[in-house]
Structure formats: structure tokens, C-alpha cells
């Protein structure tokens, strides 16, 4: 049988998990393609806050955070009904999660930041922590995507500062400072708003509300750029 196209691996979907698997399959020697049923890529990963929960990740370790595999294990077991998750899956998540982040950091454009004040959902549970397990993507200038920028699914309105025509992106760390009106929030807002206004000509040129991509958009953009470096295509609708 003759095919129009031939690939070793076809990845269906274009969220964080799908694009990460595409990177790994390519790096493992497989000819890879990503297909997305809609006319935009990124899925719910793009609209989300972009956070990734990995205990004992490299970014937390760089800040000498006090955590352990046992604490992570105790926490996961405390928030899941007994027997709901197989022990081997929990062990794999705890042991391989940090390795995945290491691989992406060292072999792609995917970079994260430690969220030192983003607590586990149940921090008082056994093994729970007040922060340093979740990460968010490093912001990135969206114009580096070129025409693919227009195909990136937009962030959820709640993950940006919106007022009339103004739609200004912020990171989770910045959002905590701004929404909580914590010390320094006025200075931060003035800085972000000034950059936003001064960038108006370029934003109008690219047809994008804010070229500074953060949260889920930043994570997807970095994955897409990493696939572009590998000449792996993403076919949309």
C-alpha cells in the first residue's frame, strides 16, 4: 500500500503532554508528526496557568528546598483514595518526573521557574508543603513564533489583566503580587504597563494583544519552538 505520508510516530493533540512526547519520540530516533483537530494548537494547556507539579525538581533543588521522595509519596497517598493509584505509578512519577524536567531543561527551549509560595492544595496533609513543588514556564516573546503565533490558543481571560482593549499578561508570581496588593505591586504594575504601552506598534503589527507570553501560553510556545528546532511539524485543522 502506498501512503501520502509516512511517520514512525503520530502524536494526536498539542497540549503539554503531547508536545513533550513528540520531542522524546523524535530524540529517540522516530520520524514524528503532531496532529491537532482544531485550527489552534495548545489545547487546555495553553489556556491554563501552565503550572507543573513535580516534587524535588531541579529548580527547587537550586534553592536548597527541604523536600524528599518520602514526603512526596506520603502526600500523594494522602490525597488519593487507597488503591486508586497503583504504587508503581506513584513511584514512577516521583522518580521520573524530575528526570523529565532535567531532560527538557538540558535538551530543549523549555525552561521553568520555581514557585516558592505556591502551596500544595492540601499543605497540612502528611508530606504536604507550603511551596517549591510547582513550577511555571519562563515568559517568552511570542514574535519568535512568527506566523505560528496566530495559531496559539489564547490564554484564559482570568490569567491576564484585562480592562477594555488592554489585555496584559502576567506570570503566576506577578499575579500573586498584583492581585494580593503585596508590597511592590504598584512598581511592578507600572513596569509591566509601560512595557505593554511602548510595545503597541509591534502588537498591532502582529495582531496580538500582548507579545509577552506567560503561563500556559509560554509553556506551549517553548515546546513548539523545541519541535521547530527538530523539524517536527504540527498539522492543525
Model regions: which residues?
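Generic cytosolic/nucleocytoplasmic N-terminal low-complexity/intrinsically disordered segments
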Residues: 1, 15, 105-106
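A conserved short coil-to-beta-strand element within the FAD-binding core of flavoproteins
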Residues: 236-237
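Extreme N-terminal leader/targeting segments of oxidoreductases
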Residues: 1-9, 27, 221
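Conserved N-terminal/central alpha/beta ligand/cofactor-binding core
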Residues: 37-233
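N-terminal Rossmann-like FAD-binding beta1-loop-alpha1 element of flavoenzymes
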Residues: 9-34
Amino acid at each position: 500500500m502506498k501512503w501520502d505520508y509516512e511517520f514512525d510516530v503520530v502524536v494526536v493533540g498539542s497540549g503539554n503532554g503531547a508536545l513533550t512526547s513528540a520531542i522524546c519520540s523524535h530524540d529517540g530516533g522516530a520520524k514524528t508528526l503532531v496532529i491537532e483537530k482544531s485550527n489552534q494548537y495548545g489545547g487546555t494547556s495553553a489556556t491554563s496557568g501552565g503550572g507543573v507539579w513535580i516534587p524535588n525538581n531541579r529548580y527547587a533543588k537550586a534553592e536548597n528546598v527541604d523536600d524528599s521522595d518520602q514526603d512526596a509519596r506520603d502526600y500523594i497517598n494522602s490525597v488519593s483514595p487507597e488503591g486508586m493509584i497503583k504504587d508503581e505509578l506513584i513511584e514512577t512519577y516521583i522518580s521520573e518526573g524530575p528526570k523529565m524536567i532535567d531532560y527538557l531543561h538540558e535538551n530543549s527551549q523549555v525552561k521553568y521557574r520555581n514557585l516558592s509560595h505556591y502551596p500544595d492544595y492540601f499543605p497540612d496533609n502528611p508530606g504536604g508543603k507550603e511551596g517549591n513543588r510547582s513550577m511555571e514556564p519562563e515568559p517568552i516573546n511570542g514574535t519568535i513564533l512568527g506566523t505560528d503565533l496566530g495559531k496559539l490558543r489564547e490564554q484564559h481571560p482570568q490569567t491576564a489583566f484585562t480592562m477594555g482593549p488592554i489585555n496584559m499578561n502576567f506570570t503566576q508570581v506577578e499575579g500573586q503580587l498584583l492581585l494580593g496588593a503585596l508590597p511592590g505591586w504598584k512598581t511592578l504594575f507600572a513596569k509591566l504597563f509601560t512595557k505593554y504601552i511602548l510595545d503597541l506598534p509591534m502588537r498591532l503589527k502582529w495582531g496580538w494583544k500582548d507579545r509577552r507570553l506567560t503561563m500556559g501560553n509560554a509553556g506551549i510556545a517553548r515546546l513548539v519552538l523545541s519541535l521547530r528546532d527538530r523539524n517536527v511539524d504540527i498539522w492543525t485543522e
